[in-house]
């Protein structure tokens, strides 16, 4: 074989091994109440890095505890804030239990769904503000390792399984339901209509091993940080954006955030608090439809159980 042929063969061999690295994608799988739909209580998403690391975000009510067969391995759980629809004071009996409008959330979780899943999967829990001690105590009480409750406060980050996790500001309340506070104090707080304080709510910015940067808004309003931090510093190209109104930004406000402040390549609506789809299609007149129509970039509705794949630039490569 002459020198040119050797070089050509070497180049082809390099291409064989290098090309898949650039083709790697992050998989995003919604874990909602009804397969193939986007429903009122749906919050949970699983992100799978190309290296296999799996991140569960805001499991809430629609993950059926640590034994939910949809979970698979979970390396880290992210919780944006302590409200029950994200933390999970109870969960569905199984995927498909109840209806899209009213899932059967009848299985109580005294230590929270987040903790039950973390114990079952031996997962890390990454939170910000003053939330980590809450989870450390409950992991210990359940026979787990309290060190698995990890802190990533504003401006800082931690890396788990090759995924870099940073917390960013969210404009939202963050009270702990008194049912998670034991003894007379919890009873008195409940009677007074008070919640525990664990500091500000958070969003997350994730940097995956393929280079994709994703912004998970949590529950929030409009913030200057969505441009100054999320866009200008982190350069997020995929956004998961709450748009349910009342408790968070509504469709118009959420569209403003992604259109004018973050400007990602793609967006996934979240926290609709409504029946967003019927038979897997946008429900006419819904807030979800209004948001999808208002954004300037592709919006991909998170249909439960349907995996989407995103490349390093935040563009959908499959499943959308």
Residue ranges and their predicted role:
Residues 1-9:
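Bacterial N-terminal signal peptides that target proteins for export
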Residues 8-20:
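Bacterial N-terminal signal peptides
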Residues 23-70, 151-231, 309-320:
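Core dinuclear metal-dependent hydrolase active-site scaffold
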Residues 36-41, 63-65, 83-87, 127-136, ...:
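Active-site environment of divalent metal-dependent phosphoester hydrolases
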Residues 43-44, 70-72, 91-95, 140-142, ...:
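Short, glycine/charged-enriched secondary-structure capping and boundary segments
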Residues 44, 112-115, 132, 251, ...:
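Extracytoplasmic/secreted envelope proteins and their assembly/folding machinery
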Residues 52-56, 60-127, 133-134, 140-150, ...:
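Active-site metal-binding motif and surrounding structural segment of the metallo-beta-lactamase
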Residues 117-158, 255-320:
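Binuclear metal-ion centers of metallo-dependent hydrolases, dominated by the metallo-beta-lactamase
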